């Protein structure tokens, strides 16, 4: 069933509100319209393009929150963090991240994104990876966007260890998962 313009724009607004990192291409597929139609709808509704939406979300003073490493050392663009709870980053897979012969992302970039996010979520000036159990579930290609989500699973104050679960997605598909045992000072 094809939606009329007013209905489509209402759903577009709701979709972007609930999923701010959705691309125009994904929206076009979802609503069965052209990318240009999605862009025109966004303009009419004064909804910024994806990059601007990402920047807007990231302006939640991440610089003041992350203690364990400088933000420019986080692989990917960190867009949300709640220390000792959860964090999110986005990595746009570009030419420099892939093998030239097949445009498949090199695994160490996906690991680095997840590992740096596991470090960044720790509410401590000292956070080091003690152990990692990781799994790559599918190849990632050039041009894809990897959204990595870290969640603190447990914290052992006596041992100074925190377990952080990280899952990385392309769209809704898990492409990488890992459990990171993080060493931290025993003060927290």
Swiss-Prot record:
GO terms for biological process: fatty acid biosynthetic process; negative regulation of DNA-templated transcription; negative regulation of fatty acid biosynthetic process. GO terms for molecular function: DNA binding; DNA-binding transcription factor activity. CDD domains: hot_dog. InterPro entries: HotDog_dom_sf, Transcription_factor_FapR, WH-like_DNA-bd_sf. Keywords: DNA-binding, Fatty acid biosynthesis, Fatty acid metabolism, Lipid biosynthesis, Lipid metabolism, Repressor, Transcription, Transcription regulation. Transcriptional factor involved in regulation of membrane lipid biosynthesis by repressing genes involved in fatty acid and phospholipid metabolism. NCBIfam families: PRK04424.1. Belongs to the FapR family. This is Transcription factor FapR.
